Structure formats: C-alpha cells, structure tokens
Amino acid sequence: ADNVAPALLGGFTLIRSYNPLDIIPVSCPDDLYSAIIHPDIELNTSDARRVLKTEVSFQNAISQSANTAGFMVALIRGDYDLLKRSMSDLLAEPYRTQLIPGFDAVKNAALKAGAVGCGISGSGPSVFALCQGETIARQVADAISKAFNKIGLLNEAFVSKVNAPGTRVTDYR
C-alpha cells in the first residue's frame, strides 16, 4: 500500500494503519515539485532492508516522529521553512546511503541548487528532492544528475509537480 496509494491517489498519502487499511490523502502547496533521479544501478529492496537496524534509540524514535509530524503540517500549511527543518531521516538514510554511490555529494548538490530537502526514494536507488517551483526543481535535477555523472554513474532525471492527479485514463482507444 505504501507504493500503490500515492500512485493511485496522487500527491502525498499517509497510511495511518494497515489493519484495517486507513489511507489519508494529504494536501500540499501548489508550487511543490519533485526532482527524481534514478542512477543506473540495481538495488534490491531486500538488500536495502537488510542494512537497517532492528532497534532504534528512544531519542531517534522521538525525533523521527517529530520530523514526520512537522513534515505533514508543513505540507498542509505550505510552510517551506518547516518542511526544510523536517526533512531529516534518522531511521533509514544513515544506513542506506552506503548502498548509493555518491549519495552525500548528490544530496549536497541538491541542497546547494535550492532543494528544500533531499533523500532516498523508498529503498533506493532513486533519489528525490522537494523543491519550491518548477524552475528550481529543474536546476536541482540537473545538479543531482551532474553529481552522479561526476562519479561515472549514468542516470535519468524526472521533474514533476507533486500534487499531480493519481492514476487516470487519458485515452481509452
């Protein structure tokens, strides 16, 4: 559901529960764009899960919960400053970065180019950056792509408005 819900519904979704399934669409600012860069490497979800810790510190759990709450409030309010402060993954990113060559340089390039925040998309290897406006998103996508190219890693870059509609039929012929 964590991958299917956003694809079907579009934008951001919060899965509050899996049993029973409780999916909540979350509004976001009209000018929020995402730059997605997919490096030409294979990364199995099982390998990405294997590097995660089975236990987290109490402080990291509290901080991650606060970041998640801040992220959701920032989306709903359109508060880019809060969004920037809330885009810190303390649970997965510190361990999964080792699986994506050049990730730290890529993230730095994204932030330097104007991204609100940058992280690993799902279990990777794709990297996403949230940006205020399409122009900045295209600049960020270019900066990330160049950072991957610099270490010899081919990649594909995509830019999309975040609150785009979900899956829909555009032509039924």
Predicted regions mapped to residue ranges:
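Acyltransferase
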Residues: V26, D31-V116
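Short loop segments at secondary-structure junctions
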Residues: S17-P20, D40-I41, Q132-T135
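Glycine-rich, charge-dense phosphate/pyrophosphate-binding loop(s)
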Residues: L75-R173
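Alpha/beta catalytic cores of group-transfer enzymes, especially the acyltransferase/condensing modules
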Residues: A1-L32, C118-I120, F128
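Short acidic, glycine/serine/threonine-rich loops at helix termini
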Residues: G10, Y18, A48, V169-Y172
